[in-house]
Amino acid sequence: MAKIYGDEDASLEPLEDKTVAVIGYGSQGEAQAKNLRDSGIDVIIGVREGGPSWERAKKDGFEVLPIPEAAEAGDVVHILIPDEVQPQVYREHIHDNLEKGNALGFSHAYNIHYGLIEPPEYVDVILVAPKGPGHMVRKLYTEGFGTPALVAVHQDYTGEAMDLALAMAKAMGFTRAGVIKTTFREEVETDLFGEQVDLVGGVLYMILYAFETLVEAGYQPEVAYFETLHELKLIVDLIYEKGLSGMLDNVSNTAEYGGLTRGKRIINKEEMRKVLEEIRSGEFAREWTLENESGRIVMKRLREEIENHEIEKVGERLRKMMGFED
């Protein structure tokens, strides 16, 4: 049974008299920094000097510093820049500015788990990972609630790393919704698996192949779009609010029977296991590193295929018709 922490299980005391240096001011960086500040935590922002994030953070009222200076000034250095740039930024701007007893914070365990960032032994290394995008992290906090999150400790130099992770989670509103104790390995492997198998990869290609199957069989693309893409939101909203059984309770008997008897035929669990093994073995991480070093050639080609697909052209027309796009 998972260990779940609520608001009453955490204290802000571990953050008293400490400065949190948030490295990066993108979607998560902005949201987490604002939540921390609104909870009374001393927050500074570390970004590339003169860039758009620098100006935006200053406009939002933060003290903004170049990354090396922010890392030196922070007691907690919370790294919220994209995974693929973290190792170089860490090596060049953060590592040498860490002091004994500092803490390194992450919202994704990727670079620590795969050994792309190797922190010194004299710092705590914690994970505070909200299970939602930055705009939702901020919105729910301002509404008096919060986003569920995961917390973990990779390295506990001070003996107080978990208390610090929970304090960070509380300050950002996550303990209001519930925070699950995990490990760096579990967070990254399940996160990548979810992205690749269903949330991004699985859903994307299920939609494309379903659309193509109908169009190739002679059905109108516009009708195929509604049946394979547009109506998906209705089902996902039901699952999100009521669970799988609740969704089945709210569709027709015909839809339920057809889905239950045919759905398994289009899903290949053996391929899912292969994807999971690629993640667990580090094969995917090595592939992604090489992809970035080569200028993301494969990713750009695949992205172009999606952008030029008929479903996108049909969808653009229909979304305009429905008033979703200008």
UniProtKB/Swiss-Prot annotation:
Domain of life: Archaea
The species this protein was found in: Methanopyrus kandleri (strain AV19 / DSM 6324 / JCM 9639 / NBRC 100938)
Cofactor field: Mg(2+)
Pfam families, alphabetized: KARI_C, KARI_N
Protein name: Ketol-acid reductoisomerase (NADP(+))
Enzymatic reactions: (2R)-2,3-dihydroxy-3-methylbutanoate + NADP(+) = (2S)-2-acetolactate + NADPH + H(+); (2R,3R)-2,3-dihydroxy-3-methylpentanoate + NADP(+) = (S)-2-ethyl-2-hydroxy-3-oxobutanoate + NADPH + H(+)
Recorded GO MF terms: ketol-acid reductoisomerase activity; magnesium ion binding; NADP binding
Residues engaged in binding NADP(+): 25-28, 48, 53, 83-86, 134
Binding site for Mg(2+) 2: 191, 227, 231
Keywords: Amino-acid biosynthesis, Branched-chain amino acid biosynthesis, Magnesium, Metal-binding, NADP, Oxidoreductase
UniProt-listed GO biological process terms: isoleucine biosynthetic process; L-valine biosynthetic process
All copies of domain KARI N-terminal Rossmann, residue ranges: 2-182
Function per UniProt: Involved in the biosynthesis of branched-chain amino acids (BCAA). Catalyzes an alkyl-migration followed by a ketol-acid reduction of (S)-2-acetolactate (S2AL) to yield (R)-2,3-dihydroxy-isovalerate. In the isomerase reaction, S2AL is rearranged via a Mg-dependent methyl migration to produce 3-hydroxy-3-methyl-2-ketobutyrate (HMKB). In the reductase reaction, this 2-ketoacid undergoes a metal-dependent reduction by NADPH to yield (R)-2,3-dihydroxy-isovalerate.
Residues noted as binding Mg(2+) 1 in the record, renumbered to the chain: 191, 195
Domain KARI C-terminal knotted: 183-325
NCBIfam families: ilvC (TIGR00465), PRK05479.1 (NF004017), PRK13403.1 (NF009940)
Listed InterPro entries: 6-PGluconate_DH-like_C_sf, KARI, KARI_C, KARI_N, KARI_prok, NAD(P)-bd_dom_sf
Gene3D superfamilies from the UniProt entry: 6.10.240.10, NAD(P)-binding Rossmann-like Domain (3.40.50.720)
Chain sites annotated for binding substrate: 252
Similarity remark: Belongs to the ketol-acid reductoisomerase family.
Enzyme active site: 108
Pathway this chain belongs to: Amino-acid biosynthesis; L-isoleucine biosynthesis; L-isoleucine from 2-oxobutanoate: step 2/4; Amino-acid biosynthesis; L-valine biosynthesis; L-valine from pyruvate: step 2/4
Group of enzyme by EC: oxidoreductase
